[in-house]
C-alpha cells in the first residue's frame, strides 16, 4: 500500500515537473521565433501576435491538463482500493 502511494507521489511530481519544463521550452522557442518573424516582416506583427497568443494558450492548456491528471492521482487515486 505504501509502495503504491510512494510511486503515485513520484509520478505526480514527474507529470507536473516534466510538463512545466516542456511547456516552458515550447513557449520560449515560440516567443523567439515570433520575435525573429516580426523583425523580418514588421507589417505582419498583428497577425503573428494573435497566432502566438493562441498557441501559447494551447501549450499552457496541455500543461494544465497534466496538472489536473496529477491532482486526480494524488487525491482520488484509482489505484488504491478503499
Swiss-Prot record:
| Gene3D superfamilies the record matches | F1F0 ATP synthase subunit C
The terms under GO molecular function for this entry are:
lipid binding; proton-transporting ATP synthase activity, rotational mechanism
Alphabetized, the UniProt keywords read:
ATP synthesis, Cell inner membrane, Cell membrane, CF(0), Hydrogen ion transport, Ion transport, Lipid-binding, Membrane, Transmembrane, Transmembrane helix, Transport
Residues the record annotates as the site (Reversibly protonated during proton transport) are: 60
Keyword Transport appears in the UniProt entry = yes
Tell me how this protein sits in the membrane.
Multi-pass membrane protein
Q: What does this protein do?
A: F(1)F(0) ATP synthase produces ATP from ADP in the presence of a proton or sodium gradient. F-type ATPases consist of two structural domains, F(1) containing the extramembraneous catalytic core and F(0) containing the membrane proton channel, linked together by a central stalk and a peripheral stalk. During catalysis, ATP synthesis in the catalytic domain of F(1) is coupled via a rotary mechanism of the central stalk subunits to proton translocation.
Which protein family is it in?
Belongs to the ATPase C chain family.
Its recorded name reads: ATP synthase subunit c
Say which species the protein is native to: Paracidovorax citrulli (strain AAC00-1) (Acidovorax citrulli)
Amino acid at each position: 500500500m505504501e509502495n503504491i502511494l510512494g510511486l503515485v507521489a513520484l509520478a505526480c511530481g514527474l507529470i507536473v515537473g516534466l510538463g512545466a519544463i516542456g511547456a516552458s521550452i515550447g513557449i520560449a522557442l515560440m516567443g523567439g521565433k515570433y520575435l525573429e518573424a516580426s523583425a523580418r516582416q514588421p507589417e505582419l506583427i498583428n497577425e503573428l501576435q494573435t497566432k502566438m497568443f493562441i498557441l501559447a494558450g494551447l501549450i499552457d492548456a496541455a500543461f494544465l491538463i497534466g496538472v489536473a491528471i496529477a491532482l486526480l492521482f494524488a487525491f482520488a487515486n484509482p489505484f488504491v482500493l478503499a
